[in-house]
């Protein structure tokens, strides 16, 4: 918790209020898809856990393979939809200063790529959850927190556009 608070403080002081707001507006537009990701993860995990309980390796492989294909399809459709919506958002919905439009578009495209990769990653998370390997999740959580702190330090000390650097690295 303390590392997260310190990271937020570093990012806010590095980006400034305007760029931090731009990042949150654009990120918030994409993060609303989190419910879709959570729903898909729960459905996939349910089937994987059931097959794990049966001990049927062939069924687990079939479920995993079908899940991969379905999630790749959903990821492609989501990517297409988000790229279409991008034109609408940047041509009237978002109120972004003209000099920051390029940086905002880079952040949006980075968020779209991150969303696509997160959707494709769902079946792998479901396998880990089905095995109930919580040590793995706790280690990943600690690593993620430290990685966010490292990204904050990179943003503080970079000479490049801090908003683009932060958007691409997150």
Regions found by a protein language model. Name each.
Residues 1, 28-31, 66, 75, ...:
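Residue-level recognition of pore/gate-forming positions within transmembrane alpha-helices
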Residues 1-49, 79, 83, 148-149:
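Signature of the first transmembrane helix
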Residues 16-17, 33-71, 90-94, 123-124, ...:
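Transmembrane-helix boundary and interhelical linker motifs in polytopic inner-membrane proteins
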Residues 20-21, 126, 134-138, 163-167:
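Alpha-helical transmembrane segments and their helix-entry boundary regions
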Residues 27-31, 70, 105-110, 133-137:
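Short alpha-helical transmembrane interface motifs in multi-pass membrane proteins
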Residues 79-99:
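Short membrane-interface helical motifs at transmembrane helix boundaries
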Residues 109, 138-170:
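Hydrophobic alpha-helical transmembrane segments
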Residues 113-143, 153-156:
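Membrane-interface junctions at transmembrane-helix termini in multi-pass inner-membrane proteins
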């Amino acid at each position: 918790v303390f590392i997260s608070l310190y990271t937020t403080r570093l990012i806010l002081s590095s980006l400034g209020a305007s760029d931090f707001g731009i990042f949150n507006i654009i990120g918030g537009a994409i993060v609303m898809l989190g419910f879709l990701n959570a729903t898909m993860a729960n459905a996939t995990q349910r089937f994987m856990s059931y097959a794990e309980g049966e001990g049927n390796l062939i069924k687990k492989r079939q479920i995993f393979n079908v899940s991969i294909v379905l999630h790749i399809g959903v990821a492609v459709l989501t990517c297409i939809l988000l790229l279409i919506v991008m034109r609408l958002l940047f041509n009237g919905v978002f109120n972004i200063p003209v000099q920051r439009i390029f940086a905002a578009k880079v952040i949006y495209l980075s968020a779209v790529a991150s969303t696509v990769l997160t959707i494709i990653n769902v079946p792998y998370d479901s396998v880990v959850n089905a095995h109930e390997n919580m040590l793995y999740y706790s280690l990943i959580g600690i690593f993620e927190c430290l990685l966010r702190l490292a990204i904050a330090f990179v943003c503080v000390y970079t000479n490049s556009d801090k908003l683009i650097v932060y958007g691409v690295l997150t």
